[in-house]
Amino acid sequence: MEVLMAERANLVFHNKSIDGTAMKRLISRLIDHFGMAYTSHILDQVKTLGFKQATATSISLGIDDLLTIPSKGWLVQDAEQQSLILEKHHHYGNVHAVEKLRQSIEIWYATSEYLRQEMNPNFRMTDPFNPVHIMSFSGARGNVSQVHQLVGMRGLMSDPQGQMIDLPIQSNLREGLSLTEYIISCYGARKGVVDTAVRTSDAGYLTRRLVEVVQHIVVRRTDCGTVRGISVSPPNGMMPEKFFIQTLVGRVLADDIYMGPRCIATRNQDIGIELVNRFITFRAQPISIRTPFTCRSTSWICRLCYGRSPTHGDLVELGEAVGIIAGQSIGEPGTQLTLRTFHTGGVFAGGIAEHVRAPSNGKIKFNEDLVHPTRTRHGHPAFLCFIDLYVTIKSENILHNVNIPPKSFLLVQNDQYVEAEQVIAEIRAGTSTLSFKEKVRKHIYSDSDGEIHWSTDVYHAPQFTYGNVHLLPKTSHLWILLGGPCRSSLVSLSLHKDQDQMNTHSLSVKRRYTYKLSVTNDRVRYKFFSSDFYGKKKNRIPDYLDLNRIICTGYCNRIYPAILHENSDLLSKRRRNRFIMPLQSIQERENESPGISIEIPINGIFRRNSILSYFDDPRYRRKSSGITKYGTIEMHSLVKKEDLIEYRGVKEFRPKYQMKVDRFFFIPEEVHILPGSSSIMVQNNSIIGIDTQITLNIRSRVGGLVRVERKKKGIELKIFSGDIHFPGETDKISRHSGVLIPLPPGTGKINSKESKKLKNWIYVQRITPSKKGYFALVRPVITYEKRDGLNLATLFPPDLLQERDNVRLQVVNYILYGNGKPIRGISDTSIQLVRTCLVLNWDQDKKSSSSEEAPASFVEIRTNGLIRHFLRIDLVKSPISYIVKRNDPSGSGLLSDNGSDCTNINPFSSIYSYSKARIQQFLNPNQGTIHTLLNKNREFQSLIILLSSNCSRMGPFAGVKYHNVIKESIKNKKDPRISIRNSLGPLGSAPPIANFFSFSHLLTHNQILVTNYLQLDNIKETFQVIKYYSMDENGKIYNPDPCNNIILNPLNLNWYFRHHNYCEETSTIISLGQFICENVCIAKNRPHLKPGQVIFVQVDSVVIRSAKPYLATPGATVHGHYGETLYEGDILVTFIYEKSRSGDITQGLPKVEQILEVRSIDSISMNLQKRIEGWNKCITRILGTPWGFLISAELTIVQSQISLVNKIQKVYRSQGVQIHNKHIEIIVRQITSKVLISEDGMSNVFSPGELIGLLRAERMGRALEEAICYRAVLLGITRASLNTQSFISEASFQETARVLAKAALRGRIDWLKGLKENVVLGGMIPVGTGFKGLVKPSKQHNKALLETKKKNLFEGEMRDILFHHRNFFDSFLLKKFHDPSEQSFIGFNDS
């Protein structure tokens, strides 16, 4: 007793709480010291103690013990706030759906994780003896995840397909779930009834297959004499010491281990914990160990390769059935594994990205040359740094240096003020190089009816040349322009042309009708019958064909001269495919820069002799009416008819004879056409002054002689400016028409600069007011010389046009009006006298005789601060057909500022005289504008009706005078939308001008230069185009030059996502056709704009057609053609994005099964190719050797074995299940032990395609001394079970009839070596540790020893051959295959 007391006094007293792991350690040490029986005795005492204490404590668990974390409220609120901002950005078109989904998942995942981390400290501080806390954190029952669901928040769930549901469950189970949350959480339940039942059966089946594959593996020999081993590196940062110890303990060394000259361990010595600790302290070089992979026995295993038995710490006994033990050890824990985990979705690669936060308030500075602007995967603007970046933060007197690692995102700008703890950078999680990613498709559906537009070039997917699948080359917006489509064939209307205004009551937008529009060129008033829904027929005459109204058909946005109908045959053709470069304001009409309007065929293909463009020289433009006369007497009349052949939308120009007109004259006069009933306040033949009142609402603009003629249509009143002479002699003036008389230079009244150069002319006209006498009216004449200035050099700047050899542009001038024909202009319109045609022509080459057509595309370049658009015409079709507007039936549009005026004034605004009735009539909200779309076959057209409700109007702007009527209508009605149409301009002429500028990339940097290559007929020069604007935090736009088209979007270009209602004065540059994102401030104290396209710009207001932007990133697929009508719910874009396949997608049991059955993963990661190329360079050198096949197959097999073991271990470890590597290795050895004979070398032994054990193939090769070609294959466990040496075991597993029939046909012999065969036949099982005693060693045994020695000699020779490869091999494997995330033994040695 005293002895015992003395012993107790020497014992150390440990005052520590003991948890599960400490308990395990204690038990293992007790077994090592005292053996099994004594240990169990001690453990019984511990158990009794535990029960006593637990009863005394009487821990009970009630619902009150679940304490919710106090910080949960604001964490959830914060996440909801972020989600709201995200939703807004998505609405504004700054992020697309995939980015939104990613970010919202990350926001909620992070919130859930923070709550989970808060849990343990919260319990510790508030209630350390909380039963829940004691129970879960001691490891007795329950784990962190379950407690997190009880007191934290349940977080994100996945649906049955493993996709994330982006609606998080915010409640925990203590607070209770709402109905929606309950339904969602039923998806992800892993302890549900369904889940458990399925899991048990799955795990059972897995165990059955595993045992099947390894049932015959028994320990039969002591040593197989192998010389190979697998090398394990000593623990470094990548591989925790715990796993290193687990890997080594219980193994047998394959090679001696030296520390310097001293041998610290010998070959075939088994490794205990002491030896491992010695290795760790000595940092021994890679240690070569024997594993089941290296064993050379074909159908069993030797003691030394297996090592110690896990049950009793000694070398395994002979006759132990290690295969079955291995199968059960892996299969049994399968019931503990989950089928799915909680955090599935794999959207984030490994948790949350790490953030770098600012240490203090201050200004941030970094070197901008080292960073590169980009978009993060959430669509935020950021800088990507490629190398280590040092960021300094300067507060009042302290400098903080922050180092940002490479490949990180910098989220702030240079010189920006940051606050303490603000996130300034995001470090990308270091993903392993071979992480598999899967491609996911996400469809975005349209929210509303309308037309689709995009703002960049779009490539056709090459396989569908005529399909409607387009790929986006760069980040851009897609816009859905709102408008209600009508389709049906109930009513046949022949009347409505494009751009006509109409009453929406005449056709119901709710019902979808289609009108087959017969195209007629007759310009009389149509009568048409609209069937009302009551069945009555009414005669209706539409009110839009007044004489003085220009019918603007097609998509022409320029005013064409309003001539009378007789000579309007040239101009009245429907110009469907015209696009116009400049659009000037009325005030600057006199000195504007020349505008070229270009005509493009519908399909975008020019034929030979097509008229490429018209050019109206402003020098030949007049504002007043008048008469044209041609110059000198020796001239003939002008070309009588220009041959304008029109077919399939292409205009060709074939002049039969073409005249040079030297000069012609324009005699101005003022003409008013009045209704017959109007009262005229001036007399015929009287002379009036300027601004005399003629009728109630018309005043004269020029002074002179008045002539009044009554005609059928009404009264025609002309005012001739000029002087009256009473001539003495009659003969000088002819009776019929006027005469042009030249004046000597310098004389006369017209004393301008031009008079020195030109002769002045006057026009003398004889007027006979009565029978008594007559007088002569001398009228001033404006002389026009046809100058040579109109060549290509003036049309295009000389440096921008270089013609190819075979594409020519010819300039053709012609005068629009016949000799002496009167020209009438109504009100303010200007009249064009001379038109210049550019005719496109090219030589017919013998080689390229096939090219009868030349496709056209647009190029945008920028010179001297102006954006210009050029048409590029190629004779060769490009492989990627640019369909800028190729498939656009509704015409091409392009519009640009030539810099003369920034705000384009709508040209229609002053055509009509205002009257109250008319304005009120057009403010009728039920009126819409028709917008015709031809369908593909052009058989009938469908209409889109733009209602007033689809447009919103900004304005009126301050400081602009406008007519009283409009002011009144604005005063009377509060709604600013009412006064949309104060003029009858074409609302909805959007498509022709939609594409006139491309969006800048959504980057926010103003120093970036993008080089666009201009290709107008092969030009060599390149231009740098600055397309970036940046906006500071106040919403001001800084842009490099003011004439540019700015994308006004405060959120895109803004670094701080600032408060949405905050706006300062912005620079207003609005151009026709521009797309505007929501929330843009146009002027100070104005309401925000709705998103849409500017279709109508006036002096004082803008009309915007509502549109919805969708952001699309490169590589997205756009469905539908440009300008096509989409209905609500149509697929608009398809995004293809990668999400990393972290271990999350298939987890637990399915994952293990996937590996063991060697099922392939759907898609291969992007960076796999590069790595394989790298391997090939190294491998080719090895494959040159005579042992090439052997080595390459070995290499493949060893690598695959190692990685399979690691993958399976990873799944089990992640669930906290510990399995010894040996068990997994035995199974993996069976999967990888077969090779497939290939067809390369026909050998005499095996037929191609036969599956043979690797060792057997090697032995055959040595015996026959000829190379056998084979390649390594991975068999799944099912296939491996069906490819054994015993047909009885195969037949008892699967496909019994097939296996037995084949065996009978082949005459297979079953040697009954395994367990299963003997069980089936009822024989004695050839296993068991006493088995060796029954079999007496015979003479053959001695022979076997001799053979072994010979073999060892052979191995020695082989080692010499392979010796020079060995170093190379080791370094190669260590470099290439070392996967940082997975520890393991790397490489293999031929030692």
Swiss-Prot record:
One Pfam family name is RNA_pol_Rpb1_4
State what protein this is by name: DNA-directed RNA polymerase subunit beta''
**What GO terms describe the biological role, i.e. biological process, of this protein?**
DNA-templated transcription
Assembly with partners or alone: In plastids the minimal PEP RNA polymerase catalytic core is composed of four subunits: alpha, beta, beta', and beta''. When a (nuclear-encoded) sigma factor is associated with the core the holoenzyme is formed, which can initiate transcription.
EC category: transferase
Family annotation (InterPro entries):
DNA-dir_RpoC2_beta_pp, RNA_pol_beta''_euk, RNA_pol_Rpb1_3_sf, RNA_pol_Rpb1_4, RNA_pol_Rpb1_5, Rpb1_funnel_sf
Q: Where in the cell is it found?
A: Plastid, Chloroplast
One GO cellular component term of this record is:
chloroplast
